[in-house]
Amino acid sequence: MAPLSAALLPWHGVCVPVCYGESRILRVKVVSGIDLAKKDIFGASDPYVKLSLYVADENRELALVQTKTIKKTLNPKWNEEFYFRVNPSNHRLLFEVFDENRLTRDDFLGQVDVPLSHLPTEDPTMERPYTFKDFLLRPRSHKSRVKGFLRLKMAYMPKNGGQEEENSEQRDDMEHGWEVVDSNDSASQHQEELPPPPLPPGWEEKVDNLGRTYYVNHNNRTTQWHRPSLMDVSSESDNNIRQINQEAAHRRFRSRRHISEDLEPEPSEGGDVPEPWETISEEVNIAGDSLGLALPPPPASPGSRTSPQELSEELSRRLQITPDSNGEQFSSLIQREPSSRLRSCSVTDAVAEQGHLPPPSVAYVHTTPGLPSGWEERKDAKGRTYYVNHNNRTTTWTRPIMQLAEDGASGSATNSNNHLIEPQIRRPRSLSSPTVTLSAPLEGAKDSPVRRAVKDTLSNPQSPQPSPYNSPKPQHKVTQSFLPPGWEMRIAPNGRPFFIDHNTKTTTWEDPRLKFPVHMRSKTSLNPNDLGPLPPGWEERIHLDGRTFYIDHNSKITQWEDPRLQNPAITGPAVPYSREFKQKYDYFRKKLKKPADIPNRFEMKLHRNNIFEESYRRIMSVKRPDVLKARLWIEFESEKGLDYGGVAREWFFLLSKEMFNPYYGLFEYSATDNYTLQINPNSGLCNEDHLSYFTFIGRVAGLAVFHGKLLDGFFIRPFYKMMLGKQITLNDMESVDSEYYNSLKWILENDPTELDLMFCIDEENFGQTYQVDLEPNGSEIMVTNENKREYIDLVIQWRFVNRVQKQMNAFLEGFTELLPIDLIKIFDENELELLMCGLGDVDVNDWRQHSIYKNGYCPNHPVIQWFWKAVLLMDAEKRIRLLQFVTGTSRVPMNGFAELYGSNGPQLFTIEQWGSPEKLPRAHTCFNRLDLPPYETFEDLREKLLMAVENAQGFEGVD
């Protein structure tokens, strides 16, 4: 019962999708085929044509119809007519010719992809003045064998009168969103079709491998589907010049000094309700005088908005320039503007008391109802909702939440009890935003306790005790849901949220909810009875078939999904799509070549309870690493699974758990958490053959990347930089050990002479402390203001490189036996992490959007609705276990579920109806398919799904 964006009505061979926006009715006549390819044994074919209307930029299909089949001919004559309502600017028609087969799949005979922007329009005074055109049939891929032509007639119906007027009369009597167009196939008169206009200078027409025509602009290196014209190019250049002039005028206007006079906003004509604009205040420092500027509110109609030049001229006439202005004039102005005072009360009070403070300038920012001031809700090209913060010009996938932020810091600029309502934002974990500990008292302090704390931290970098000098003690606490005990979230002056840990008296930019392992971020699953009330404007009702559905009276739509389960805190962070990474990955896969002189597959038969040692012996016994590039074939003892990708994915998952387990002493957790891994510098004390094991781990990592699988583990960022041979900097220390980072940063920004530091480090091993010189005779060289940068570089080199150099070399030896290191270097350290380990978070919305259904299931089927409700009610750990149960891995590819791979290439997550309600669900990991019985109640589905996920182990059949 989701809202309809397009309705489709076939009627007497007529197909009219009703699309909102600028649209026209297109008459298409499939006349005949000429000299088609021979596909049948007896030298003929049974051709028919399939017509697909789709959106060019999104490749989203809007309508699909086909002609009748003409038997045993290579020159069929269909003479069938269709009508489409299209948007000429971004719609295209795809004609595909097939040879019908009763027993096997229909053979492909060719295709034609036609843009709709330059088709002619019929003249009502003449009868069918448009003529046919023969289109060359093009192949779908390089393997397609096609020939011949497709003869078509295409023209737009006139905009006024005729067919569309009749349709508008019929449409008044019908339900909204549907339209009927009569089919009328009469004789046509031929006339010569005008050739398309010439391309502008610098443009080129090309055809892609699907036979679609596109146009290349060599001037600005862009491509597009619709044919450009000289008028488009000239208007584009005019727009660019106009935009440059507007920006210049805007800069000139902003550089002027204005004093605002008492301007009352004019009410909109006709009682129109204005757009939801809010007035926010922004402090502006201008040397010399204290100046204020009040802009008039924008008009209600978007079409009447003025340009910056007009705005500048209007304000120049209405504003007065007064050289001896003061804060009292501005204060009185704000008091006469109650709407402005509500949003800038604290600033106004400060101006009233201190005349020398600069007054705020008032700006108008578009605000979406229900969001904090300055926030706007938008949708991207893929239909995903995101939020724009006009206050600090940032965007986020997470909906901002309104909460009161109490400022308890001393020395505030305002003495008023009124405070701005600021949004509290839960942002997804950024791949390149390590933990930053704010330590203003530490940086500016000169007393001996601070110096002693810095020296203690440097002498023992692995100390887990936090420094008490990192942040002032707040006077107020604001409790927020989902945060760990003792944590608080606030907003910095630049609008960026930061987090306060009252347990250790530290602050950080990174969300503490994302510092825990994925499976620990939510302790328990949700209960359907504990979801709370529905959002404002929503209503819950029962359908005739007994199912519950929900009505949104705000937007007048209905849906099956519970809106309370669409909270980003429940669905998970959105997947950040990266087109650049996709291009690099495709290039990387093309360069990987499988040797010709190796077996068809590399087999391993293992026991689950001894997977680490058996895998080590089997892989290290291979003398020629190229053999590992053959297809992996994994078998677990006493299991009958046939490995077509799923068993291998589970092998990588299980082996990762063992290899990276700190119990074996090869890796250890980093200083800041218990899930990010780093190489253990003392691994040789735990295992004499540790270098051989690191070579084995390198081979496994290379195997995973070569075969497109993912490892289950996170490493610190310097680990990936060492793999790429990049220089490790002080900023890399920040995400690993923030306390040690703060100490080194303090040295960098201050004179360290008084600390009495030497070019040596105290290292503690098993209770004993050893002194390590950073350079020869380092214990005799003092750290001064002149050599402090060299000291910091040596500390970082020792901390991340020197101690683990042998282990890293062994790891790279195994890794480069399968993958050339030069090919890996096309990625940066962030992309290399995604290449090896993928994403750990599960975005349920992305998961649901890229799922397909078979054997009677569809998105609105009750069982499918219950399934996704059960997934949304799961905690993060159970979602990952469900993903691992169906796909064999707990990781998600870089660009989300759209890039899931199966045994034969890309394979979306699939749910197929199977079995009876008494059976448990079963999975086929090689096909990413879940066989889900048609359960009769939600409780039954949830119980049996969890039972299958938590208790199933092993393979049988094809996986």
Swiss-Prot record:
Its protein name is E3 ubiquitin-protein ligase NEDD4-like
Query: Carries keyword Cytoplasm?
Result: yes
One annotated GO biological process: receptor catabolic process
Q: Which residues cross the membrane?
A: none
Which reaction equation describes what this protein catalyses? Answer: S-ubiquitinyl-[E2 ubiquitin-conjugating enzyme]-L-cysteine + [acceptor protein]-L-lysine = [E2 ubiquitin-conjugating enzyme]-L-cysteine + N(6)-ubiquitinyl-[acceptor protein]-L-lysine
Region entry Disordered: which residue ranges?
A: 183-206, 248-275, 289-316, 408-478
Gene3D superfamilies, per database record: 2.20.70.10, C2 domain, Hect, E3 ligase catalytic domain, Hect, E3 ligase catalytic domains
Q: Where is the C2 domain?
A: 10-130
EC numbers listed for it are 2.3.2.26
Q: Which SMART domains match?
A: C2 (SM00239), HECTc (SM00119), WW (SM00456)
Q: Which residues form the WW domain?
A: 197-230, 369-402, 481-514, 532-565
Q: Which residues form the signal peptide?
A: none
Q: Where in the cell is it found?
A: Cytoplasm; Golgi apparatus; Endosome, Multivesicular body
Q: Which residue windows does the record flag with biased composition (Basic and acidic residues)?
A: 444-455
- Which positions carry Phosphoserine? S316, S346, S430, S432, S433, S448, S459, S463, S467, S471
Role played: E3 ubiquitin-protein ligase which accepts ubiquitin from an E2 ubiquitin-conjugating enzyme in the form of a thioester and then directly transfers the ubiquitin to targeted substrates. Inhibits TGF-beta signaling by triggering SMAD2 and TGFBR1 ubiquitination and proteasome-dependent degradation. Promotes ubiquitination and internalization of various plasma membrane channels such as ENaC, Nav1.2, Nav1.3, Nav1.5, Nav1.7, Nav1.8, Kv1.3, KCNH2, EAAT1 or CLC5. Promotes ubiquitination and degradation of SGK1 and TNK2.
The gene coding this protein: NEDD4L
Example of a GO MF term:
sodium channel inhibitor activity
Question: Which UniProt keywords are present, listed alphabetically?
Answer: Cytoplasm, Differentiation, Endosome, Golgi apparatus, Phosphoprotein, Repeat, Transferase, Ubl conjugation, Ubl conjugation pathway
Q: Which organism is it from?
A: Pongo abelii (Sumatran orangutan)
Tell me where on the tree of life, at the top rank, the source sits.
Eukaryota
Chief subcellular location = cytoplasm
Q: Which residues form the active site?
A: C926 (glycyl thioester intermediate)
Quote the record's activity regulation: Activated by NDFIP1- and NDFIP2-binding.
